[in-house]
Amino acid sequence: MRRAARASAPGKVIIVGEHFVVRGSLAIVAAIGRRLRVTVRSGGKGIVLESSMLGRHSAPLPGQGAAAKVSPVLEPYIAVLRSLAARGYSVVPHTILVESGIPPRAGLGSSAASMVAYALSYSAMHGDPLSAEDLYSVAMEGEKIAHGKPSGVDVTIAVRGGVLAYRRGENPVDIRPGLTGVTLLVADTGVERRTRDVVEHVLSIADALGEASTYIYRAADLIAREALHAIEKGDAERLGLIMNAAQGLLSSLGASSLEIETLVYRMRSAGALGAKLTGAGWGGCVIGLFKEGEVERGLESVVESSSQAFTASIAEEGARLEEF
Ligand code: MEV
């Protein structure tokens, strides 16, 4: 076994299909050039997590010590560790150092990237890095603790990178975008929320709407298929229209908020071809599709209402081991 190993995974934006993907609709998701890096170092006592964003947390190794109350921040990591142990990796005391360029609880896939990068670095420290398939299964154990009912879209994109058409239970399909001359602007409302709370709320509204909600889900699925064609054909105007329609459907199931709508309408009035929430909603981030010449205007338009805004580049590479 090596003394330490390091791995990273990308964040993501869901272009269309969040929430609907939980119940089997299609989602289109892209990995972005912001990554989260995890260094695992053996030694010390139990498990210690150090992160500039999440603070310092420690816990006994699973199965050792009294059943102490574990910090909720560490619980998903412990679920990943248990899953690794079930696959034959020995459980040793270690420190997990998380360095991230992805804001947490903002809909950009920070928790999935951390589960994936942790599982990859821990397995690599044992000299046997997980395959992409196993990485998905192990990281999903952590995501279930963090998210409740994850569709798997966040973990899949963190493992694979690129742009994917994702439907729960099916093999994801790589998309070759044909879009040129456009940029995706990401603006953070600065409002943090837990994905599991929003997912539960949206599902409860869908259930309360009964049969009517099946039409909303069906429309979301058709919209995502249209988005896939528009992205492949390079039809940015049509993709923008689809993003706006997707925002309406998400809003109809209670995923939006005043902060999100403010950013959406600011972007649209600054010339966005389309703008919508990305990720779970309520807070977190909004994405806007801009012609390259107009993205500066878009950035200016959101300054007052967002905690941070940036243009997102697509990351071809998914999870990877890092030298250090
Ligand atoms: C969160 O990034 C996406 C959701 O659809 C939840 C999920 O798919 O697991 C809201």
UniProtKB/Swiss-Prot annotation:
**Cofactor(s) listed in the protein's UniProt record:** Mg(2+)
Q: Where is this protein found?
A: Cytoplasm
Residues the record marks as active site? 154 (proton acceptor)
Keyword vocabulary terms for this entry: ATP-binding, Cytoplasm, Isoprene biosynthesis, Kinase, Lipid biosynthesis, Lipid metabolism, Magnesium, Nucleotide-binding, Transferase
Q: List the transmembrane segments.
A: none
Superkingdom: Archaea
Q: Which GO terms describe its cellular component?
A: cytosol
Coiled coil spans: none
Record InterPro entries: GHMP_kinase_C_dom (IPR013750), GHMP_kinase_C_sf (IPR036554), GHMP_kinase_N_dom (IPR006204), Mev_gal_kin (IPR006205), Mevalonate_kinase_arc (IPR022937), Ribosomal_Su5_D2-typ_SF (IPR020568), Ribsml_uS5_D2-typ_fold_subgr (IPR014721)
Please give the Gene Ontology molecular function terms for this protein.
ATP binding; magnesium ion binding; mevalonate kinase activity
> According to the UniProt entry, what is the EC number of this protein?
2.7.1.36
The protein's annotated catalytic reaction(s) are: (R)-mevalonate + ATP = (R)-5-phosphomevalonate + ADP + H(+)
Biological process, per Gene Ontology: isopentenyl diphosphate biosynthetic process, mevalonate pathway
The residues listed in the UniProt record as binding ATP, with positions renumbered to this chain, are 103-113
Q: Which SUPFAM superfamilies match?
A: GHMP Kinase, C-terminal domain (SSF55060), Ribosomal protein S5 domain 2-like (SSF54211)
Q: What does this protein do?
A: Catalyzes the phosphorylation of (R)-mevalonate (MVA) to (R)-mevalonate 5-phosphate (MVAP). Functions in the mevalonate (MVA) pathway leading to isopentenyl diphosphate (IPP), a key precursor for the biosynthesis of isoprenoid compounds such as archaeal membrane lipids.
The record's listing under NCBIfam families reads:
mevalon_kin (TIGR00549)
What PANTHER family does the record tag this protein with?
MEVALONATE KINASE (PTHR43290:SF2)
Q: What is this protein called?
A: Mevalonate kinase
Identify the species of origin.
Aeropyrum pernix (strain ATCC 700893 / DSM 11879 / JCM 9820 / NBRC 100138 / K1)
